[in-house]
UniProtKB/Swiss-Prot annotation:
Top-rank lineage group of the source organism: Bacteria
Location(s), subcellular: Cytoplasm
EC numbers for this chain: 4.1.1.37
Name recorded for this polypeptide: Uroporphyrinogen decarboxylase
Site (Transition state stabilizer): residue numbering on this chain: D76
Gene Ontology CC entries for this record: cytosol
Gene from which the chain derives: hemE
Matching CDD domains: URO-D
UniProt GO molecular function: uroporphyrinogen decarboxylase activity
Species lineage: Bacteria, Bacillati, Bacillota, Bacilli, Bacillales
Pfam families linked to this entry: URO-D (PF01208)
Entry-linked InterPro entries: UROD/MetE-like_sf (IPR038071), Uroporphyrinogen_deCO2ase_HemE (IPR006361), Uroporphyrinogen_deCOase (IPR000257)
Family: Belongs to the uroporphyrinogen decarboxylase family.
Biological-process GO terms, alphabetical: protoporphyrinogen IX biosynthetic process
Length: 344
């Protein structure tokens, strides 16, 4: 890689002309890399994030290996929750587990606030360290209020989100207070990361697709409007992403953000037809990375042909990299996207 700074990703976020389609992958730092798996034999996720030099190494590894156009900070959306009074444990094969789920208005009232400089200095130190090392933009991220709330109410991952919806419908006052508290936490946490040097922010609303449009507008969209309006003042690109949320992309397009992330269920041309005018990011089905190269290349080409119709397009997956994916496949895919987009 050249030592000069590669700002292709930032240009694409703003819809500015650039010479190739930028590429990065959700969960590019981690599970599919042998070097990472070796580190995980010794340290947990949270232990890695608390060691800035080690965390920076893990974050930077896929950029060096795949020649990607952006790095995304290695951490978890659960990172800030312990500091507002939520006990979280990441269990192998199960994900985040919370032993004291939210069940009442009083539970919501008890939640505290985060002081990033005191509570998560290692996150900020890692960002500062990476800014010294990287020659591509650094993306950081946070969980959106709805998705964090779903974990806090369900006590962990869910397939139906019945407890979350029941709480939302039965306790609207408590729900909106919870959204307000999580919105403020997100704003404070993200602003500190931007101040430390993060050059773009992705908000993961991973599970909001469980809601219909009407409920999204009433129970979630107001806090997202406030959150993005505050973060927009920091003048870095803001990205929104959720899974199974194709019916909400037009709602996201209304928000004060820069990039709409798509999962693999909605084609880019369909998103444009639905009225998405902002930069689009996505959206190769991560399962396709387990197929023969000819299939991967053909699907990537289909996505590129749609994305290349405007300069505001970023190539990514429609969800995170699977552990079974070969690192060489990702390296080859990045090279293909760069070459094909530069010549078309």
């Amino acid at each position: 890689m050249s030592n000069s700074f590669n700002d292709t990703f930032l240009k694409a976020c703003k819809g500015e002309v650039h010479d190739h389609v930028p590429v990065w992958y959700m969960r590019q730092a981690g599970r599919s890399q042998p070097e990472y798996r070796k580190i995980k034999e010794k340290y947990s996720l949270f232990e890695i994030t608390k060691q800035p030099e080690l965390c920076a190494y893990v974050t930077k590894l896929p950029v060096d290996q795949y020649n990607n156009d952006a790095a995304i900070l290695y951490k978890d959306i659960m990172t800030p929750l312990p500091f507002i009074g939520v006990d979280v444990e990441i269990k192998t094969g199960k994900g985040p587990v919370i032993d004291n789920p939210i069940q009442s208005y009083a539970d919501v009232e008890r939640l505290g606030t985060i002081q990033p400089e005191e509570d998560v200095p290692y996150v900020l130190d890692t960002i500062k360290l990476l800014r010294e090392q990287l020659t591509v933009p650094l993306i950081s991220f946070a969980g959106a209020p709805f998705t964090l709330a779903s974990y806090m109410i369900e006590g962990g991952p869910s397939k139906s989100y019945n407890k979350t919806k029941a709480f939302m419908y039965a306790e609207p006052k408590a729900w909106h207070l919870l959204m307000d508290k999580l919105g403020e936490m997100t704003i404070t946490y993200v602003k500190a990361q931007i101040a430390a040097g993060a050059q773009a922010i992705q908000i993961f609303d991973s599970w909001v697709g469980t809601l219909n449009v009407q409920d999204y507008r009433v129970f979630v969209k107001p806090v997202m409007e406030r959150t993005f309006s505050e973060l927009q003042k920091e003048k870095v690109p803001l990205i929104m992403f959720g899974v199974g949320a194709s019916h909400l992309v037009n709602e996201w397009n209304d928000l004060p953000l820069d990039v709409v992330g798509l999962d693999w269920r909605l084609q880019i041309k369909e998103a444009r037809e639905l009225g998405v005018t902002k930069t689009v990011q996505g959206n190769l089905d991560p399962a396709i990375l387990l197929a023969p190269w000819e299939v991967i290349e053909a699907r990537a080409k289909e996505i590129l042909d749609q994305g290349l119709e405007t300069p505001n397009f970023i190539f990514n997956l429609g969800h995170g990299v699977f552990p079974e994916v070969e690192p060489d496949t990702l390296k080859r895919l990045t090279a293909f996207v760069h070459e094909y987009s530069a010549n078309n």
